[in-house]
C-alpha cells in the first residue's frame, strides 16, 4: 500500500510517500512544499495545489493521510493552515483518493506508542522505522512521514479515521 502523509502548512507543507507491505516500510519520496510570505495567499495555495497534484500523479498513492489541525491561539495562523489543509484535501479528492485524518496525539501513539512523546522521539522513530541515515528536515517532513507511518499502523481501524 502506498501512503502519502501530509503535515499541512502554508509556509511549509511537509509530505512523505511510503510503501507499506508485509509490515515493512520503504520510503519512496519526501520533501517540503514551501511558499514565501511575500507571495499573495491565493498564489501560495495554488502552488501547494499544483505541487501536490504533481506528487499524487507521479506516485499514485492508495491513500492519503493528513494531520488534523490542532487548536491554535493565533486565529489568523490557524485559518491560513486550514486553507492549506483544504487545498491538500481537494487535491487528493480530485484524484479520487481515500483521505484519512489523524490528530497529533494519534500520530504520536501510532509511531512511538506513547501520546506524550516529544518531537525528537518521534523523529528518531521515523528515522529508525524507515531506515534513514538521518532525520528528515525540516520538521514538517518528518511529521508528514510520521502521519503516513501512523496510518500504516492503524491497520483494520482505518475506517474510523476516514474523512466522510
Swiss-Prot record:
Name a GO CC annotation attached to this entry.
cytoplasm
Co-factor binding comment: Binds 2 Mg(2+) ion per subunit.
The UniProt record lists the EC number as 3.1.21.10
In terms of Gene3D superfamilies, this protein maps to: Ribonuclease H-like superfamily/Ribonuclease H (3.30.420.10)
Where in the cell does this protein reside? Cytoplasm
Q: Which domain of life is it from?
A: Bacteria
List the catalytic activities from the record.
Answer: Endonucleolytic cleavage at a junction such as a reciprocal single-stranded crossover between two homologous DNA duplexes (Holliday junction)
Q: Reply yes or no: does the keyword Lipid metabolism apply.
A: no
Active-site positions on this chain: 7, 67, 140
- Cofactor(s) needed: Mg(2+)
Locate the residues binding Mg(2+) 2: 67
Self-association or partners: how does it assemble?
Homodimer which binds Holliday junction (HJ) DNA. The HJ becomes 2-fold symmetrical on binding to RuvC with unstacked arms; it has a different conformation from HJ DNA in complex with RuvA. In the full resolvosome a probable DNA-RuvA(4)-RuvB(12)-RuvC(2) complex forms which resolves the HJ.
- Full protein name: Crossover junction endodeoxyribonuclease RuvC
The gene behind this protein is ruvC
Amino acid at each position: 500500500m502506498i501512503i502519502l502523509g501530509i503535515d499541512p502548512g502554508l509556509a511549509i507543507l511537509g509530505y512523505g510517500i511510503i510503501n507499506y507491505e508485509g509490515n515493512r516500510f520503504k520510503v519512496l519520496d519526501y520533501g517540503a512544499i514551501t511558499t514565501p510570505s511575500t507571495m499573495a495567499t491565493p498564489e501560495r495555495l495554488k502552488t501547494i495545489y499544483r505541487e501536490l497534484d504533481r506528487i499524487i500523479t507521479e506516485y499514485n498513492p492508495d491513500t492519503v493521510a493528513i494531520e488534523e489541525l490542532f487548536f491554535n491561539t493565533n486565529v489568523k495562523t490557524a485559518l491560513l493552515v486550514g486553507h492549506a489543509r483544504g487545498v491538500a484535501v481537494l487535491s487528493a479528492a480530485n484524484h479520487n483518493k481515500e483521505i484519512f485524518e489523524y490528530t497529533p496525539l494519534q500520530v504520536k501513539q501510532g509511531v512511538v506508542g506513547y501520546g506524550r512523546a516529544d518531537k525528537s522521539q518521534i523523529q528518531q522513530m521515523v528515522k529508525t522505522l524507515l531506515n534513514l541515515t538521518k532525520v528528515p528536515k525540516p520538521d514538517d517532513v518528518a511529521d508528514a512521514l510520521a502521519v503516513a507511518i501512523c496510518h500504516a499502523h492503524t491497520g483494520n481501524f482505518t475506517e474510523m479515521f476516514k474523512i466522510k
